[in-house]
């Protein structure tokens, strides 16, 4: 267990469909950090790129995403920084917008997005199936809640994480750029912090 968890945010610009390039870029960033951080965090749907739209409905593309996650896992065999990263996940006949925890050469766990937006430029309810409300993950002895984007806009998701023992919230996000949106996002983040008395990395 660590007493001070060092988190790096990889605010990279993935290309939609370029799974190999996106993975290679993240591996390169991680190798440059060496032992300076405990957790490297990449955005929502980073592996596939975002917005993904109908590309995520292709079986061959989902296979490529799985291969990309496997390659990321191999890169963590050195037992240095863990990776939190977003990617689509196929489960039987459904596709989910998920976040993966990758460490020590393995995909240790995942969580699925609960709140799927379906307005304006967002069309996630058509292509994804929502996950369940779930608890935090344990990374290096710290219980971390990892909601995905829209999840922090609803009180119940963070409340569930807090009630199930989260010590910190790390929310991954990917959205089209909107000039006037930053203040609104900040307001939502502050509301979740005040309601649950938990630190939040966004």
Which residue ranges define each predicted feature?
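Enzyme catalytic cores with a strong preference for nitrogen-chemistry domains
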Residues: 1-202
């Amino acid at each position: 267990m660590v007493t001070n968890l060092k988190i790096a945010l990889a605010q990279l610009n993935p290309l939609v469909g370029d799974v190999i390039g996106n993975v290679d870029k993240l591996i390169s960033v991680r190798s440059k950090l060496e032992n300076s951080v405990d957790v490297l965090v990449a955005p929502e749907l980073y592996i596939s790129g975002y917005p993904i739209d109908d590309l995520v409905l292709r079986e061959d593309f989902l296979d490529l995403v799985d291969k990309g996650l496997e390659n990321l896992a191999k890169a963590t065999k050195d037992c240095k920084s863990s990776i939190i990263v977003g990617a689509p996940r196929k489960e039987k006949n459904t596709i989910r917008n998920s976040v993966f925890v990758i460490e020590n050469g393995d995909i240790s766990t995942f969580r699925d997005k609960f709140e799927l937006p379906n307005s304006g430029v967002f069309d996630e309810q058509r292509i994804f199936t929502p996950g369940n409300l779930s608890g935090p993950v344990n990374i290096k002895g710290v219980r971390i809640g990892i909601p995905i984007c829209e999840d922090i806009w609803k009180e119940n998701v963070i409340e569930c994480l807090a009630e199930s023992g989260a010590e910190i919230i790390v929310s991954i996000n990917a959205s089209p750029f909107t000039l006037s949106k930053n203040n609104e996002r900040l307001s939502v983040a502050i509301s979740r912090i005040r309601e649950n008395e938990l630190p939040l990395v966004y």
